[in-house]
Amino acid sequence: MTVCSRRNFVSGMGAVILMTGTSLPAFAKENKADKPKRYAMIHDENACIGCTACMDSCRDVNQVPEGVSRLEILRSEPYGEFPNQEYEFFRQSCQHCTNAPCVAVCPTGASFIDKETGIVDVHKDLCIGCQYCIAVCPYRVRFIHPIHRTADKCNFCRDTNLANGKQPACVEACPTKALTFGDMNDPTSAVSRKVKEKPVYRTKVELGTQPNLYHIPFQHGEPRR
């Protein structure tokens, strides 16, 4: 687990936008069957306890080697005085951007957005390990798999748990239910409802990436700047 200063912790996340939920107008409420799925995730920073069960489960289910990780939980410096201290935990992983720079720069088409789910993924048989996608990703969440020698990252367990009708490994493992996953194009889904009902933010939205990883901000420390 990474420990960093409050200033570095906040500045490293880039600019954020806070949003409050609003109801969709009647004309915008389309039948969910009219659209493909757009999977998204919410990380609740108030519920997360930094136990890293999500990281361990991801590593196990997706056979991620030691030394690399598809997701990280970053921990801030403590707020308050001992013994009444609290920590802020931040999930860092692929944002599954609707406008993904990694897809745009890939010379072989290995980096792609799955049309059925909106998940950003990698065709390992097409990847040549050029690392263009790693260089261009503003979230710094891609890496070269040390065994396959291809680009790798979180893919919401698309080829493991999701393929078997389960939730992503991190969601299933979280003991405090800090993660919510589902289809943003389904207005009845838990993730869609929560984005409308809770104050949420996404990181580096000013870059136009349209990330699909949302965060419910930590309420007990300093306000984000």
Curated annotation (Swiss-Prot):
Sequence positions that bind [4Fe-4S] cluster 1: C48, C51, C54, C174
UniProt keyword terms in alphabetical order: 4Fe-4S, Electron transport, Iron, Iron-sulfur, Metal-binding, Oxidoreductase, Repeat, Signal, Transport
Signal peptide (residue range): 1-28
CDD domains linked: PsrB
Residues annotated to bind [4Fe-4S] cluster 2: C58, C154, C157, C170
UniProt entry tagged with the keyword Iron: yes
Keyword Nucleotide-binding belongs to the record: no
Binding locations of [4Fe-4S] cluster 4: C106, C127, C130, C133
Post-translational modification: Predicted to be exported by the Tat system. The position of the signal peptide cleavage has not been experimentally proven.
InterPro entries: 4Fe4S_Fe-S-bd, 4Fe4S_Fe_S_CS, Cyt_c_NO2Rdtase_NrfC, ET_IronSulfur_Cluster-Binding, TAT_signal
Start and end residues of each 4Fe-4S ferredoxin-type domain: 39-67, 85-116, 118-147
NCBIfam families to which the protein is assigned, alphabetical: cyt_nit_nrfC
Alphabetical list of PANTHER family matching this protein: PROTEIN NRFC (PTHR43177), PROTEIN NRFC HOMOLOG (PTHR43177:SF3)
This protein's name: Protein NrfC homolog
Native source organism of the sequence: Haemophilus influenzae (strain ATCC 51907 / DSM 11121 / KW20 / Rd)
Name of encoding gene: nrfC
